[in-house]
Design a protein with these regions (language model features):
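Short, structured active-site-proximal loop/turn typified by the sulfatase FGly-forming signature C/S-X-P-X-R
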Residues: 40-87
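Active-site neighborhoods of enzymes that stabilize oxyanions during catalysis
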Residues: 265-373, 377-388
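Bacterial Sec signal peptide processing site at the extreme N-terminus
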Residues: 17-26
Length: 409
């Protein structure tokens, strides 16, 4: 016998049931990098937009980078799901026996050689499966990796104001169906710049964080004006955190060897050098165990935890500074004195297990869980998450789909 009260209860339960998740083929992912956002800034600085997105979506207590916890290697890990040894971008600055020139963040000509870039960045994964992708600044996006790029991309210009970066993304999102990207990237450098100059505990770092938060708010408003709120999923990350520096924690290379006798590819906090005369053992002996906060290794003897032992793009001699210590030269310290400048206030690149190196992870949108807080996890798993959100099959990677499964609706 049909009971009106039971019918009313069933109707109420149906109305209260959470709406079904958005189909993956209609989902859009916007991957936002806030360079240098440390794991604890969300609580310390209370940015309104990011705090709201974190509450409405999935938040991690920290995002663990790869070593060295530098910008280019970790940005490329995020979009490939590969460790540094597997995708090849082992540092911001490196050399390879089979590629001419020195790779650096400022050397666009050398960066353009596709032989540096391994793996399958997600914009290529998406495009190969019939989707459109757009990259508003991301390491690797300016190079044809595997013979292809995103449909839309921009040459990196750190002087481009944040509002123009956001405007470009909104312009792409307002394209008609079929031309509109399903995967987009966006990058902000304000906070990393402030952290390096003034340190992670400075007022300037807080101001930079809130400035970026306002830009993210502009993006969210633009997505709403484009009528895409119910389709857009935000994946907001940082490549690393930031550790404070001090004049009292300097390692001056000149105290142990003449810098002119070596090709120093990388400085701090991971020293990478090759002796000009080819005598690796002599230079290794000059540095080994000379400073209690500098750990020196031959390339083949780098501890397994760092995942880079024997890699041909790693310098023959590597020195790794302890967290908070800075490797420098007498020439650099003299310049600080001459111009009455302070040394850098902060840096990164340290052992990825250091808490100060952990970054930000927020994921919010119709394909993602609401109000979920997860323990810190490695950034190699982000590629699988983003592929799952937009419904594409991931290429081979080092992530574990089980790590991100509970984040999905």
């Amino acid at each position: 016998m049909w009971c009106p009260a039971l019918a009313g209860l069933l109707l109420l339960l149906t109305a209260c049931r959470e709406a079904p998740p958005l189909p993956a083929d209609r989902a859009i992912v916007i991957l936002i990098s806030i360079d240098g956002w440390r794991w604890d800034y969300l609580e310390r600085f209370s940015p309104p937009t990011l705090s709201r997105l974190a509450a409405e979506g999935v938040r991690a207590e920290g995002l663990i980078p790869q070593f060295p916890s530098k910008t280019f290697p970790n940005h490329y890990t995020i979009v490939t799901g590969l460790t540094l040894a597997h995708h090849g971008i082992v540092s911001n600055n490196m050399q390879a026996p089979d590629i001419p020139g020195t790779f650096s963040m400022s050397n666009r000509d050398v960066q353009a050689d596709p032989r540096w870039w391994g793996g399958d960045p997600i914009w290529n994964t998406a495009e190969r499966q019939g989707k459109v992708a757009a990259a508003m600044f991301w390491p690797g996006s300016e190079t044809k990796v595997g013979g292809r790029q995103a449909t839309f991309w921009r040459d990196f210009d750190d002087d481009l104001p944040n509002h123009e970066r956001v405007s470009q993304l909104i312009e792409w999102l307002k394209l008609p169906e079929g031309k509109r990207p399903s995967f987009l990237t966006l990058y902000f450098s304000d906070l990393d710049n402030a952290g390096h100059r003034w340190g992670p505990d400075s007022d300037q770092a807080r101001e930079a964080a809130l400035r970026v938060d306002r830009s993210v708010g502009e993006l969210v408003a633009g997505v709403a004006s484009a009528g895409l709120t119910d389709r857009v999923n935000y994946v907001i990350v940082s490549d690393h955190g930031m550790a404070a520096l001090s004049r009292d924690r300097m390692i001056v290379v000149d105290d142990y060897l003449d810098p002119a006798t070596a090709d120093i590819v990388d400085w701090s906090p991971v020293l990478g050098l090759s002796p000009n005369d080819g005598d690796v053992e002599k230079m290794y002996a000059a540095l080994k165990d000379k400073h209690p906060h500098l750990h020196v290794y031959r390339r083949d003897e780098i501890p397994a935890v760092y995942g880079l032992a024997g890699h041909p793009r790693v310098s023959p001699i590597v020195g790794i500074a302890d967290e908070g210590w800075y490797i420098t030269s007498r020439a650099e310290t003299d310049r600080w004195l001459q111009h009455e400048r302070n040394p850098p206030g902060g840096t990164h690149g340290y052992d990825a297990r250091a808490k100060s190196m952990q970054g930000l992870f927020i994921a919010a949108g119709p394909r993602l869980r609401r109000g979920l807080v997860v323990k810190p996890f490695e950034n190699i798993h982000l590629y699988n998450l983003m592929c799952a959100v937009i419904g594409i099959a991931p290429s081979k990677n080092d992530g574990n789909p089980a790590v991100i499964q509970d984040m999905l609706r």
